[in-house]
Amino acid sequence: MLVLRCRLGTSFPKLDNLVPKGKMKILLVFLGLLGNSVAMPMHMPRMPGFSSKSEEMMRYNQFNFMNGPHMAHLGPFFGNGLPQQFPQYQMPMWPQPPPNTWHPRKSSAPKRHNKTDQTQETQKPNQTQSKKPPQKRPLKQPSHNQPQPEEEAQPPQAFPPFGNGLFPYQQPPWQIPQRLPPPGYGRPPISNEEGGNPYFGYFGYHGFGGRPPYYSEEMFEQDFEKPKEEDPPKAESPGTEPTANSTVTETNSTQPNPKGSQGGNDTSPTGNSTPGLNTGNNPPAQNGIGPLPAVNASGQGGPGSQIPWRPSQPNIRENHPYPNIRNFPSGRQWYFTGTVMGHRQNRPFYRNQQVQRGPRWNFFAWERKQVARPGNPVYHKAYPPTSRGNYPNYAGNPANLRRKPQGPNKHPVGTTVAPLGPKPGPVVRNEKIQNPKEKPLGPKEQIIVPTKNPTSPWRNSQQYEVNKSNYKLPHSEGYMPVPNFNSVDQHENSYYPRGDSRKVPNSDGQTQSQNLPKGIVLGSRRMPYESETNQSELKHSSYQPAVYPEEIPSPAKEHFPAGRNTWDHQEISPPFKEDPGRQEEHLPHPSHGSRGSVFYPEYNPYDPRENSPYLRGNTWDERDDSPNTMGQKESPLYPINTPDQKEIVPYNEEDPVDPTGDEVFPGQNRWGEELSFKGGPTVRHYEGEQYTSNQPKEYLPYSLDNPSKPREDFYYSEFYPWSPDENFPSYNTASTMPPPIESRGYYVNNAAGPEESTLFPSRNSWDHRIQAQGQRERRPYFNRNIWDQATHLQKAPARPPDQKGNQPYYSNTPAGLQKNPIWHEGENLNYGMQITRMNSPEREHSSFPNFIPPSYPSGQKEAHLFHLSQRGSCCAGSSTGPKDNPLALQDYTPSYGLAPGENQDTSPLYTDGSHTKQTRDIISPTSILPGQRNSSEKRESQNPFRDDVSTLRRNTPCSIKNQLGQKEIMPFPEASSLQSKNTPCLKNDLGGDGNNILEQVFEDNQLNERTVDLTPEQLVIGTPDEGSNPEGIQSQVQENESERQQQRPSNILHLPCFGSKLAKHHSSTTGTPSSDGRQSPFDGDSITPTENPNTLVELATEEQFKSINVDPLDADEHSPFEFLQRGTNVQDQVQDCLLLQA
């Protein structure tokens, strides 16, 4: 037309000559202008090779836009790989490759037909025809993700001849709208084909202002009959398509209609439907193109079933986020989720942020769908109301925003989903591919959707996650983590359920639980929380204390199988972060909710926990003063706070990575480093809040990351359920432990502090890890940690679960190593055993506070009481269940029994709290090592303390060298031989000598260093071996070792039990003899012990050395220089640990 116009212009003189100037010229000019104006519609309507506008549109419609340029930046939104969009101007040619690239989205060449085919056989007959009709498009769009590739395939057939020149305007409008109306993109979701144009402007522009989906297609198809070569068949296709639209018409008609019914957006419905189809289908098959149709037809039972798809688009959407991430090629899903896309992008971003998140997100979203959907009845209802209820705004807004274009759809779909409950069932089937579960979930989701009607999208927790993610991101930075959590809704709400755990337990359970089959259990478990979730929608403060106490004592345990709840509470913690004030409450809630309540169930689940943590809070404040303290305190606090295993579990989840390389997880580093850095305030904010504040954003990744780890969490959760409750007595004890707060002054804090360190090791460990990250004045921090550990001592019993909580960190942190494997095993066993133990030793722990307050106001006494308690735990534990602890706690018993003389100092808490932790101390040998190290170091730092400890150890029930030497040695020798982990408690090789050596170790710094080394495995090695073996190892790791020995004497003492077992367990896995030279003597059992500490250090080094860092602080108060050495070496050790862990 432009050419015509130009011709007209150029030939105007001739025309004027030929025709009367006035009229003809005007006519021609008018015609030229008209043609020019029409030119674009003509271009748009049909490219030469395309039989129909639908076909044209199909070219670009992976993401409903051939014009990737505009959408190129949105490529991630619409599909993670939107390469197609970038070369979209080349789209005519591009669609074919992109379809392949976007295979899930568009299966390249056959896609067009396949889309039609996939959409339906009816569509398939119509495929050629359907190429033209927008209806078919809409139809396809319901199936768009699956059909889309087909669309792409055939349109490429049609359009490749056309070349790229036209498509930017023509094709993009056509194909883009046709491809998928990105509901999220400002264009009205009117036209599947046009409305779906990512260029809203384009489509409004191309489509002559967003004409109705069929109008655009029909108009163009009819307008441009020239391309309608195939249009006549396509004309049939409209008829057929309506038939397909009858069958799948519901997809077309219903899509628009259900869209209208759902959201009133045809495009949105199409987007919904198409993405939904893809979404639902995508869960079955991320590529899902083939599977998608299968799921579509299969899940929905056929073209007609796709109607359920459409209704189930919410569910599909639920899947959609998941498929989106999975099927990034399903850019359309992303696309149609234009809003969702943003959210989803955030979600994927979060997921991507947490690299595991994508997969895990898939895992979560999918698994949550899988598991959560199964658990949906419980989870989704509770979870959406909870998590989405927790984020009702987010839920509603995500529903509105993310599903805003779909909002009408999605919300109605949410509502419709309730109506669609049956359909969501099928859809869930498709979407979840867990039709049965999903179907129940469909109702649940219905319920959930009603409950969280605004969160109807929330009901689609995955979509909601997407929504949440994006939504919450918009909602608030603080909530951004929540968006992550929301986006990870199941993830992060999995975290969030930490805070909201019982409230978001659905999300959590769904997401986290989905990560693990436990999620289903969590579902049921969470169902209680759903009530809590709904009431928890009160939100964290009200809900969490109530929910958490309820949940934690019973649900916490129960919930811990919902380890995701465990880390979900972490996730909730980040959400708490979103609500800093609330968060603090919440975090305590989440923390105490899962563990805080467990810790201080009797205390205000979160208040006493907060109080207790704020006893710690004082410590914590000081810890806040020192980021490390903060970190450590935070660690305990958070573990205590996250005592809800949820908070901790996330660190479990995260620490594993952090353990892996001091990776500075958002969790660990963000706790420790971020905590350290912003931890002071943030930690002060609350450890949970720090999580919440610091982590939530970063936690978001953690949330997502944690979702990955929730499995660990699960282990821990499983273990945790008891641990929190059973540590809970310890925490009650911790409540009585305020004397330990006094103890802070005296180095009961060293003992308790070591206890704390032992308690902390997980926390201290990761805190050390954080410290190792070199953040804080290690020593001040350690002082804080020391007295903080004293504070933690007062919390120490409170902490044991915290240590468990920390231990998740520990487990995760040291190992990541045995993320949960060992500690979860150990935790399971150890929690069982340790709970038993906790019941007796930790009851001792409970008595321990009594010991401390009554008879041992002194740090030494307290420390010894800790030893006693821990010893009771270790030895008594050994006696109680040497086999149990050795075997059940094998890896942890060492930790637990690691310091009969000294480790038991820390072991009391460790035995129970830390021992549970030691259960995780397999990975958190450093937990014990640090604690033990702290204890030993502290003791070696202060001989009186050590002497007292030795005496107390001797006096301590199990600490009593008879018990220790015999009981512990007997059980532990076996365990030590078995696992060499028992050495600590049993001082396995130490035997009776161990007691003397313990004495010596505690009495003599020399022995403390040397005998500590020897104490673990071969105190028999005694000072000489310590001198020689450690020295030789020192030579290897002289810098680290000599300082580390100083650092490690206690550590070795602590490590022995753990170190031996862990050394064996981990040393064989990852021996780093040089790092832990002293642990070689320490692990007399196996020379690997040298590396065992490093293996432990690997696991525990980060934690251990961080605990050593704590020890430096602990010892700083005692022997600043020695601990300075240690502190310095701690760094080195931390480096070793980091090296090992890295």
UniProtKB/Swiss-Prot annotation:
Disordered: annotated segments = 88-193, 214-326, 398-671, 874-955, 1020-1048, 1062-1092
- GO MF annotation terms: structural constituent of tooth enamel
Biased composition of type Polar residues is found at: 117-128, 240-285, 452-470, 507-516, 531-544, 924-934, 1068-1078
Q: Which residues, renumbered to this chain, carry the PTM Phosphoserine?
A: S191, S216
Residue ranges, compositional bias (Acidic residues):
652-661
One GO CC term on file: extracellular matrix
Instruction: List all Low complexity biased stretches.
Output: 140-162
Supply the alphabetized keyword list. Amelogenesis imperfecta, Biomineralization, Disease variant, Extracellular matrix, Glycoprotein, Phosphoprotein, Secreted, Signal
Q: Which residues are glycosylated?
A: N114, N126, N245, N252, N265, N296, N467, N534, N934, N1040
Protein name in the entry: Enamelin
Q: What is the lineage of its organism?
A: Eukaryota, Metazoa, Chordata, Craniata, Vertebrata
